[in-house]
Amino acid sequence: MKISVFYEHIEKACEQTKKPLEEVLEHVKKSGIDGIEMDYDMLSSEDDEQSILTSLKKARLVISSIYGFCHLDSDPEEQKCLDVIDQAAKNGCSRVLLVPGFFSEADAKIFGESADDWEKTVAFMQSNQVVQNIMAGLRRAVAHAKEKNVIVTLEDFDSTLSPCSRINALKWFMEQVPGLCWTLDAGNFAYSSENILDAYEVLRTYTAHVHCKDRG
């Protein structure tokens, strides 16, 4: 098992301790952490990318996953989701986490009312245009990622507006997009009041990555 930490948390540690980035990264490595969870937007500038990668390499740390917020809800042909994958492949990172888009308040209400029931969830997902756009975009992304030896994942996202926030919805996406995997976030089911053990029972065969989080 390999352990990683979010780069944003490293930046926060620098801010709180007033220590330079290099010293915090050295502490991270000495603590048994080998990987960094990276926001794609932090790497979108060539100068920022080079600076971050140089610091990580010096500390003997690698990027374990790159996550990116996309807009497949409105544009299944969006380029950004492919750019996230390309960035991962470029840096030897084997997985990405895509946050593919969000519902309107009205659609989120209907989604929430059906999410506890599998058959109702299936009916909603099949009829909702946002979901259909996301599904098409994810199929395209997974096909592109396969060529790059990168795994595409979704997580149980912590928002009632997210089509990926409920167990049944995640199961539906996994079944409809062959090759798609799950990043288990241990804290985000607090938003849907669903049991993480129930989620694991349903989705464990799709698990590729874990975010450990205590929201108790």
Model-derived regions, located:
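Gly/Pro-rich active-site loop or hairpin
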Residues: E11-L21, D75, P163-I167, K171, ...
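Conserved beta-strand positions in the central sheet of alpha/beta enzyme cores
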Residues: E37, S65, L97, T153, ...
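Short, surface-exposed basic-aromatic patches at helix termini and helix-loop junctions that form
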Residues: L53-T54, M174-E175, E201
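Active-site acidic/histidine proton-transfer and metal-coordination neighborhood
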Residues: K58, D73-W182, Y191
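N-terminal pre-domain/capping segments
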Residues: M1-R95, F124-Q132, C181
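Active-site beta-loop-alpha junctions enriched in small/polar residues
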Residues: F6-K12, D39-L43, G68-L72, G101-F103, ...
